[in-house]
């Protein structure tokens, strides 16, 4: 019984460490605007999109607004992310806004 519990705990920890943060699509209208209106967990192309001024890479070449304290958690690469595919990211965000209707 103890072995099963230990294995389950280690497995859960391993899965949580490797899980990457996905930008929240609800903030698609704020991606690439550079006006500092994006909320924490919303997508970003750089720090000027974020209220916190911290755009962290999510380890999959996507930006997510983060608090500086949490910028290196859950696979994030820290503040200072600059999206190398900015034009494509902004295009996808605009498509998401049309799809959502807001």
From Swiss-Prot:
TM regions (residue ranges): none
Disulfides per UniProt: none
Coiled-coil zones: none
Subcellular location: Secreted
Signal peptide: 1-19
UniProt main location, coarse: secreted
One of the record's GO cellular component terms: extracellular region
Sites carrying sugar chains: 46
Keyword Glycoprotein among UniProt keywords: yes
Keywords attached to this entry: Glycoprotein, Secreted, Signal
Gene induction: Expression is highly up-regulated in invasive hyphae.
Functional note: Secreted effector involved in biotrophic colonization of plant cells.
Name this polypeptide is given: Biotrophy-associated secreted protein 2
Annotated gene: BAS2
């Amino acid at each position: 019984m103890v072995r099963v519990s230990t294995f389950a705990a280690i497995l859960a920890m391993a899965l949580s460490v490797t899980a990457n943060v996905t930008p929240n699509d609800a903030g698609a209208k704020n991606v690439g605007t550079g006006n500092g209106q994006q909320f924490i967990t919303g997508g970003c192309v750089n720090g000027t999109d974020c209220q916190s001024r911290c755009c962290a890479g999510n380890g999959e070449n996507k930006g997510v607004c983060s608090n500086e304290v949490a910028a290196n958690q859950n696979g994030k690469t820290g503040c200072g992310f600059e999206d190398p595919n900015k034009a494509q990211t902004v295009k996808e965000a605009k498509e998401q806004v049309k799809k959502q209707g807001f």
